[in-house]
């Protein structure tokens, strides 16, 4: 075996020796004698086969004082009590030993220590960060191929197209242009992006003509061209082709109910024309910049709702199309929260349950101006301070080791909706494990990187959500068909149906998503909604903070209070909400209208307001004031 590995890896193959000599009574004392025996042969084989030795230490915790906490963690993971004589034991030597400790431990084999440093010098820098790894979408050959595009377009053509705006104006310096081409993967990748971008434009404009009719208005054409330009020059047309493909397959091939759209993707006219969403962003003043902003380079994120039963069918369709080795779910790591850490440690130490519950209940739900963890809770709660200094060693140790184990990974799960579709076998890019599919019982691939890390790797995440509401609607439509012989298309139901508004006005909304609470029903009866915009506004206002504006909103609708605009031109965007700024989109549109903010600047303003970034707002205030004054608006009103 040694010779085989040496032939395979050459000078990069080493023999590893370890020495874990237990020094405390309650530890694994069987390991070290076996290591002594094995190390003797390793040194012999090292000379015989001319393979270098390295010395290492198995590392499971940071330093020696964590050994006892690790011991309790092993009890938790194996389901054993601390005093169980048959439980798994480590040597308690498995900490990250210092150079001095390793030199002392392996003083008799200095060449092995030297070889360990040699091995360290061979380790190359590696980063998991990567540009987006876009799956390949099959474009019909009669539309065009990459090879045809390489013959048809020069690199100069591509450079001009990707460094100009949608109107053909040069918007990047030569240096910035070259950097952009490099970031997108170079000219080789650009041919693919252009092909996908052109095909996406064809599908989008075909959809626009079906929805808006011909000829398209200048407003629609300008919006479509702007969005398609951003999608293409950010390198994402393939993403939208893939999403529209599985959504249309769900609707037309699989008979699965698909939601009308949620989140910032509803601001895309291209998504609307492709059938990804069912909301017209132009009609409702929804903004594309909230979804994709060239000033904020990040992957698109479209959450797609399917009926509960159909979600699994869509995932199987995607897996069959792109290949089982290229589709994976995303792992989740469950960590030990404060109260759970106390209860877990108490259980393995056999602290009485009543005392365990008492200690856990002492932990507050939140601590003013501080993060909730056991360390801060002890400072905040005198009874926990007393427990930490208790004369009872079981109580004292419970607090001590719970504090050390809090935040450790307790178990793994599978992300409820996140799914990766990869260009290559997913194992080429990230480590994977397997998990059981709850629906089919079959094994499925799961990335070992969690969601917060996945985007850095460049892998493309799609969110497939199962929504019970869609299942209920689907079942209701089927029941109507069976009992009344009526074929109903939910998408064709008149949004201005008076009978429906009567139900809302009477507060009869039990079972209606986001409109069923008693408080919401009360306000609906007072509002007497008569337009879809009324319902949208009420939904947006019914949350902590904006709720204070609901009485004023209702009074303005019914004429009990005048509808006032600080600056007359603001009526353009505040008319539907009776002069009250309800939506973040209104903030963005008003900043452009009043102060000539760019699309990117208006989005930055939205984020700063949403996150209460005082410094950012103070920084943007002079620009807003200056822009408003240039447009002839009163400085005092602008203030």
Where on the chain are the PLM-derived regions?
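Alpha-helical scaffold/interaction cores of sigma-54-like transcription cofactors
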Residues: 1-639
């Amino acid at each position: 075996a040694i010779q085989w590995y040496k032939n395979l890896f050459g000078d990069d193959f080493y023999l590893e020796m370890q020495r874990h000599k237990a020094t405390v009574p309650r530890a694994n004392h069987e390991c070290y004698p076996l290591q002594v025996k094995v190390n003797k042969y390793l040194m012999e084989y090292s000379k015989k086969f001319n393979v270098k030795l390295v010395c290492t230490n198995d590392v499971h915790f940071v330093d020696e004082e964590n050994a006892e906490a690790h011991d309790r963690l092993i009890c938790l993971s194996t389901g054993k009590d601390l005093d169980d004589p048959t439980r798994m034991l480590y040597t308690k030597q498995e900490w990250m030993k210092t150079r001095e400790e390793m030199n002392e431990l392996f003083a008799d084999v200095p060449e092995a220590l030297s070889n360990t440093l040699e091995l360290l010098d061979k380790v190359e820098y590696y980063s998991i960060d990567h540009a987006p790894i876009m799956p390949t979408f099959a474009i019909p050959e009669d539309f065009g191929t990459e090879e045809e595009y390489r013959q048809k377009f020069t690199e100069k053509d591509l450079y001009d197209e990707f460094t100009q705006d949608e109107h053909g104006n040069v918007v990047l310096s030569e240096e910035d242009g070259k950097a952009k081409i490099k970031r997108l993967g170079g000219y080789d990748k650009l041919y693919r992006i252009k092909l996908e971008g052109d095909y996406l434009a064809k599908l989008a404009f075909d959809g626009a003509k079906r929805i808006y009719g011909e000829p398209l208005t200048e407003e629609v054409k300008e919006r479509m061209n702007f969005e398609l330009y951003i999608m293409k020059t950010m390198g994402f047309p393939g993403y939208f082709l893939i999403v529209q493909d599985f959504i249309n397959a769900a609707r037309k091939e699989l008979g699965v109910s698909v939601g009308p759209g949620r989140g910032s993707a509803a601001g895309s006219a291209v998504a609307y024309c492709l059938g990804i969403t069912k909301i017209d962003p132009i009609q409702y003043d929804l903004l594309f910049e909230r979804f994709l902003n060239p000033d904020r380079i990040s992957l698109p994120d479209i959450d797609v709702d399917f009926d509960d039963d159909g979600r699994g069918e869509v995932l199987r369709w995607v897996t069959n199309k792109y290949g089982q080795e290229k589709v994976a779910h995303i792992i989740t790591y469950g960590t030990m929260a404060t109260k759970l850490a106390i209860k877990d440690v108490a259980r393995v130490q056999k602290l009485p349950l009543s005392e365990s519950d008492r200690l856990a209940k002492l932990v507050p739900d939140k601590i003013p101006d501080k993060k909730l963890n056991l360390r801060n809770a002890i400072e905040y709660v005198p009874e926990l301070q007393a427990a930490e200094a208790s004369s009872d060693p079981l109580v004292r140790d419970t607090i001590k080791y719970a504090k050390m184990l809090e935040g450790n990974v307790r178990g793994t799960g599978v992300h409820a909706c996140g799914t990766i579709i990869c260009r290559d076998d997913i194992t080429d890019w990230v480590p994977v494990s397997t998990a059981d599919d709850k629906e089919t019982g079959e094994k499925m691939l799961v990335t070992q990187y969690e969601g917060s890390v996945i985007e850095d790797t460049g892998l493309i995440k799609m969110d497939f959500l199962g929504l019970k509401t869609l299942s209920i609607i689907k079942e209701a439509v089927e029941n109507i068909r069976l009992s009344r012989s009526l074929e109903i298309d939910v998408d064709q139901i008149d949004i201005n149906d008076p009978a429906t508004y009567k139900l809302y006005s009477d507060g009869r909304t039990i079972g209606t998503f986001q409109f069923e609470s008693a408080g919401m029903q009360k306000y609906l009866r007072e509002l007497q909604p008569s337009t879809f915009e009324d319902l949208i506004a009420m939904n947006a206002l019914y949350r902590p903070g904006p709720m204070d504006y609901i009485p004023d909103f209702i009074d303005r609708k019914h004429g009990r209070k005048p509808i006032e605009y600080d600056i007359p031109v603001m009526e353009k965007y505040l008319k539907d909400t009776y002069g009250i700024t309800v939506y973040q989109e209104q903030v963005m549109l008003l900043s452009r209208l009043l102060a000539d903010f760019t699309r990117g600047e208006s989005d930055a303003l939205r984020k700063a307001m949403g996150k209460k970034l005082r410094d950012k707002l103070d920084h943007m205030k002079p620009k807003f004031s200056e822009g408003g004054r240039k447009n002839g608006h009163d400085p005092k009103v602008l203030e």
